[in-house]
A protein has these predicted regions:
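Acidic, mature catalytic/reactive cores of soluble proteins
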Residues: 1-548
């Protein structure tokens, strides 16, 4: 991420995603160690040490904050808990990183020097530790309050797109505001499951966090009031924390987080939907450094960015009808089969210095209109999640086809960081797309995923993805056991036309928990199976419509 061959903050969390599928041993400790890179102000260390859990203070006086960094830990943590059922991870404790940067990189702590150390302390000089839940809340709540003039989360130094780096004053990332809204809803969901499993009614949190838990629509509507709440919190813990903890009702906390998530999604639906002259629509993803909406049908042509579509789809902001319009618009303005699928953006036709350096690249190179594998895969993932399997498959297949076409891509098979305007694969070793591609094929296309430790089978395979025997199968590890899962589509139905009729495990028909389009194999049933063999699951698909 930083041009020096080292690992960046996002890498830590995306590597864990892949490991959870390929080699899950040790991931729990890795997660705990990674959380120690979070600061108490919700930002995080950006220089990663050579050892696991080692973070280095930035000595270059560069106080750059990537506003998306708080998103990724929750995505990985949720995936881990769903795969394992290990809700107790939420109550495990980790330290907080400390250096001279405070107030989310806007001020310097003049009282800090290296003799203080790199771990946050309380006023009593004791190392501050908080639960994983507390770390997640701080990352997502501080972001919720750090808004620009249009009440979306500020872009700051950049988001996932590192080249959106010239709008630190007035820039806003609507794209990742959606992601944070989704995270707040997901934390609420995990809290509900935690309460149900443990029987606990309260959680212990840093006393200062209470100010971030005000629940009031009038507050949410006001940029000024939000920034005041954030500043109060940042001031309260800018050098040391109080060291005090408070007990918070899980039920009230869950409700609080849902209200924030719902408010943010509704705000985006209401204000950020744009249309072209033919009434086809998509979401605006950004505001530039003049405070202007970036996307839409402008005097210089249509401006559309893929990132701004991925997260409203994935988080649930976009309605099904809006998704239909987004896919139509993306196919029209972003899709180019010759270069590997969905470009990151349309050609803005200007060097837009009030948004980022990306517009200084020639169109089709790097972040300016290349097919960026990571976001193209996440677009597919989001579409699959919402039941748009055909559209999701189109993005994945385009990347695969381009990678395999050596005459054009000039790369060994695999996923590069991006395909340029000539369709050539670039930076084969710099990609988080591989983790997400594997994740999407297994958990969405084949539909084998965890849900707080249960195994969910929810295939979203297209008719043409079954072989001549009408079968599609995969092998994987889940719950410390090896599995081969085979779907039988004897009636030759397409996704949306079939549902699960029968499930057998090692030749025995089982009573699965049925839903219209998925089967649930409970964790307690899985635990009774031996760990020494590859367990065979056969799933029979039969006529039955899925309603989107």
């Amino acid at each position: 991420d930083y041009g020096k061959g080292g690992r960046g903050w996002r890498d830590l969390w995306q590597d864990c995603l892949a490991l959870l599928i390929m080699n899950p041993d040790g991931v729990r400790q890795m997660l705990l160690d990674n959380f120690a890179g979070v600061r108490v102000d919700g930002s995080n260390a950006t220089i990663i040490g050579s050892k696991q859990g080692e973070f280095v203070a930035d000595r270059n006086h560069i106080t750059r904050v990537w506003m998306d960094h708080g998103v990724w830990p929750m995505i990985t943590t949720k995936f881990y808990i769903d795969q394992t059922g290990d809700l107790e991870l939420l109550e495990k404790e980790a330290a907080y990183f400390k250096d001279k940067q405070i107030a989310r990189g806007t001020r310097t702590d003049t009282l800090w020097d290296e003799s203080y150390g790199y771990w946050q302390k309380t006023k009593r000089g004791v190392r501050e530790e908080g639960t994983i839940l507390e770390h997640l809340l701080l990352q997502n709540l501080t972001a919720f309050y750090e808004v620009g003039e249009h009440n979306n989360i500020r872009l700051r130094g950049a988001d996932w797109n590192d080249a959106l780096d010239m709008a630190s004053e007035k820039g806003e990332s609507v794209a990742f505001s959606n992601a944070y809204a989704g995270n707040l809803a997901d934390i609420a969901e995990l809290l509900e499951a935690y309460r149900k499993k443990t029987g606990k009614e309260t959680v212990s949190l840093l006393a200062e966090i209470v100010s971030l838990l005000e629940d009031n629509p009038a507050l949410y509507d006001s940029v000024e009031k939000k920034l005041h709440v954030l500043e109060e919190y940042l001031h309260a813990c800018e050098h040391d924390t109080s060291g005090e903890k408070v007990e918070i009702s899980i039920e009230k906390l869950t409700e609080n987080l849902r209200h924030k998530s719902e408010w943010l999604m509704e705000h985006i639906r209401k204000n950020e939907w744009v249309k072209d002259s033919e009434e086809s629509g998509w979401f605006n993803g950004y505001y530039d450094n003049h405070g202007r909406q970036v996307e839409g049908d402008t005097k210089t042509g249509v401006r559309m960015m893929l990132t701004g579509q991925v997260f409203p789809i994935m988080a649930g902001t976009a309605t099904d009808e809006q998704i239909r319009q987004i896919t139509k618009s993306a196919d029209r303005y972003l899709y180019d089969e010759k270069v590997g699928g969905y470009r990151l953006n349309t050609d803005f036709g200007e060097v837009k210095t009030d948004l980022g350096r990306m517009f200084g690249f020639s169109y089709g190179d790097k972040e300016n209109g290349a097919v960026f594998s990571h976001m193209a895969v996440m677009y597919a993932n989001a579409l699959y999640k919402r039941g748009f399997a055909k559209e999701g498959c189109k993005s994945l297949h385009a990347l695969y086809r381009q990678s395999a076409n050596f005459e054009v891509s000039h790369i060994y098979p695999g996923i590069p960081e991006y395909f340029n305007g000539r369709g050539r694969g670039m930076y084969h070793y710099l990609t988080g797309a591989a983790s997400w591609y594997m994740l999407t094929v297994i958990t969405e296309m084949f539909g084998v995923r965890g849900q707080v430790g249960d195994m969910i089978l929810e295939p979203k395979l297209l008719k043409e993805q079954f072989d001549e025997e009408k079968k599609a199968s995969l092998t994987l590890q889940f719950a410390d056991k090896n599995w081969k899962i085979t779907y039988l589509n004897c009636e030759d139905k397409d996704y949306g036309e079939y549902q699960i009729a029968d499930v057998t495990v090692d030749g025995e028909k089982i009573n699965f928990v049925p839903k219209q389009h998925e089967a649930i194999l409970p964790k307690n049933m899985i635990e009774k199976l031996s760990g020494n063999e590859t367990h065979q699951i056969e799933v029979v698909l039969a006529q039955g419509n899925i309603t989107l």
